[in-house]
Amino acid sequence: MSNFLPDSSCYELLTIIGRGFEDLMVVNLARYKPSGEYVTVRRVNLEACTNEMVTFLQGELHVSKLFNHPNIVPYKATFIADNELWVVTSFMAYGSAKDLICTHFMDGMSELAIAYILQGVLKALDYIHHMGYVHRSVKASHILISVDGKVYLSGLRSNLSMINHGQRLKVVHDFPKYSIKVLPWLSPEVLQQNLQGYDAKSDIYSIGITACELANGHVPFKDMPSTQMLLEKLNGTVPCLLDTTTIPADELTMKTSRSSANYGLGESTAVSNVRAANGESTLHPYLRTFSSCFHNFVGQCLQRNPDFRPSAGALLNHPFFKQIKRRASEALPELLRPVTPITNFEGTRPQDPSGILGWCQTWSSWMWMTGNSRKTKTALGSGGAFWTL
């Protein structure tokens, strides 16, 4: 953890950029006064948390202290201030991959950009799996990109250890808490909750779903009822990349992104009739062809039988990544154009909800989870010292 002081007076809270955790959490852009560096501060009202919520937060902080990898979001400081848990992390100037496809790449990113992003995520997953954990929440909103184009995996709150009494378990059975918003990304074996359990290969399925999300502009199974989604996955329905090889040619002449939604098992967030500045319809947004290596990569990740899915380490050697010739920090900023990272904070006032980041009021990257009860007042058994990691 970086040498940032665990003292709230060292941080000037600026624009609110997100809320979550049953509205018990507020996320601020902040300035670290000793260095002038801009950071993100997540503040959780502990007095309103249930004991279960506190235990959940303790688990995340334990993992954040344990992990140390260049593709996992580092926690700069964690501490208690006036009955609030403060978590300080770097400010990610490009936001999350979900932010990018919602605001700029509504019909999907380029294949090369996706390759760079997924390579970073797989490196993080390979590390997490070797540490004996399952991530259980791989999705675009948990993939963050820094100002210099580096890729980071977040969402550590959902991590589950597969080590019990010093022994690595073959499978686990725990269903992720507060997981309603992550259901489309979860593997069939996690969803079915049977005695067979699941292991780290469940994260590989989530990689396949995330690849489709980044390529198609929307997550497969979007807005599908939970029961139907479960049946589709258990019956072996496999989402795909939307391009000229998966969409009938006659539909590609319709010049809409909505016509092909069923093939991706979801509905695109793009406007139905895409029009140019002169009012004329443009070409169909999915009139493109992804490489056979990309299709194969997704197919391997989405195998119904987890035993047939490659490990994260094996996937890093997949031919899909041979197109990568440079470091992500060199290539991604170019591939994400015309998007530019947020680096100008002039005019951003303390606690100003309409400041420079007003456009990202509900950044999905920071929407932690939803729960059901917050009536029980928590008792911090180990005191504030536990939280100062």
Swiss-Prot record:
Q: Where in the cell is it found?
A: Nucleus; Cytoplasm
Keyword list, A-Z: Cell cycle, Cytoplasm, Nucleus, Phosphoprotein
**InterPro entries listed in its UniProt record:** Kinase-like_dom_sf (IPR011009), Prot_kinase_dom (IPR000719), STRAD_A/B-like (IPR047173)
Tell me, in one coarse class, where this protein mainly resides: nucleus
What does the entry state regarding organ or tissue expression?
Expressed in brain, hypothalamus, heart and skeletal muscle.
Q: Pfam families from the xrefs?
A: Pkinase
An annotated GO cellular component: cytoplasm
Q: What is known of its domains?
A: The protein kinase domain is predicted to be catalytically inactive.
The protein's job, in short, is: Pseudokinase which, in complex with CAB39/MO25 (CAB39/MO25alpha or CAB39L/MO25beta), binds to and activates STK11/LKB1. Adopts a closed conformation typical of active protein kinases and binds STK11/LKB1 as a pseudosubstrate, promoting conformational change of STK11/LKB1 in an active conformation.
The UniProt entry, under PANTHER family, shows:
SERINE/THREONINE-PROTEIN KINASE FRAY2 (PTHR48014), STE20-RELATED KINASE ADAPTER PROTEIN ALPHA (PTHR48014:SF20)
Record-given protein name: STE20-related kinase adapter protein alpha
